[in-house]
Amino acid sequence: MRQIQMVDTQTQYQRIKTEIDLAIKEVIDSSAFINGKIVQEFALNLAKYLDAKYVVPCANGTDALQIAMMGLELKPGDEVITPSFTYIATTEVIALLKLTPVFVEVDPQTFCIDPVAIRNAVTSKTKAIVPVHLYGQSAAMEQIMDIAREFNLYVIEDNAQAIGCDYIFSNGVRKKTGTIGTIGTTSFYPSKNLGAYGDGGALYTNDDQLAVKLKMIANHGQSKRYYHDLVGCNSRLDSIQAAILNEKLKHLDEYAEARRRVAGFYDNAFADCAKIKTPFRASYSDHVFHQYTVILEGVNRDELHKFLAEQKVPSMIYYPVPAHQQKMFAQYNSSRLHMPVTDWLTQRVISLPMHTELDEEQLNYISSKVLEFVNR
């Protein structure tokens, strides 16, 4: 049996090695390592895939969130509603820009931000909502957009974990996550469903003027070379990463299907185990399974994590400490917040290996070891 990995980028690379190597060679031969034509080509291809009007590539997913908030001209003291149960980058940029994070609960089934909690958190200072499409499943965007329209709020979708996911509106219309709100952001970190071989990120929007502003901010605020109209940053997707992503984009839907097959295998393996709650699929979302995250009941999660490691089965805890309890947010007194759903989840979730290259032998071994511990 091949070594089991949480993410197997090497085996995936071997399947498309010829195309990837040629794409990288073309960039090297051109010497256009920064802002080469392949960057714009990738942006156009991604926009077409997403059915978004504009895609603005940048250096990483965290920068994408920061550039989005800068582009919307959010001011110090403005409140931004965000889940606490998320990767820290979502919330970190809010504090970095001296905005005020307002942490709210998630839906215990979908792990995504709870629309009822959003509505209850809106104040006169609220300017934006940041829904996170966590683990590969969409947040309840129709309800979120209704709230945003009612209170005239921006919506910045953190789509780092759900690129390729479809949201299905109540009228049957489908839209890709990240294209529904004011701005969508994503990360091309290597472990992502569409991952580079280094860092990378992007923003997407359908707003003409906003797209111009986002492009400027990502490149030192330049309107043209050496003319800087806005305060910006140095956040560019390099040409080699763009070339890699441009090739991998062709396989994104295929990768999502492979992930769904893995998820289906796990579902069947754990179907008769009451102590393992497998991922819920919302009727309004296609799940692209960036992670396969289960909730444990009556099981010592940390001991399972340790046992699996001893059995050469990697697993991860996403996330052991929610944002509102992190020291970096002490100035907001957020640790005092009563967030029972978030606290409950952080004690019980565990993520199993999830990627496109898992085979049946590996999956049988993983699931058998999980059940061996759980059924003790």
Model regions and ranges:
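A short alpha/beta connector and helix-capping loop motif
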Residues: 112-119, 170-183, 363-365, 370-374
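Phosphate-binding glycine-rich loop
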Residues: 31-79, 93-97, 103-105, 170
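PLP-dependent aminotransferase-like
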Residues: 70-166
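Structural detector of well-ordered beta-strand residues that form the stable sheet scaffold
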Residues: 56, 81, 102, 155-156, ...
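N-terminal "arm"/small-domain region of PLP-dependent enzymes with the aminotransferase-like
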Residues: 1-32, 37
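Conserved active-site segment immediately N-terminal to the catalytic lysine
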Residues: 157-195, 225-229
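PLP-dependent aminotransferase class I/II
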Residues: 10, 22, 39-45, 49-55, ...
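Hydrophobic/aromatic ligand-binding patch that stacks against planar heteroaromatic rings
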Residues: 93-94, 147, 176, 193, ...
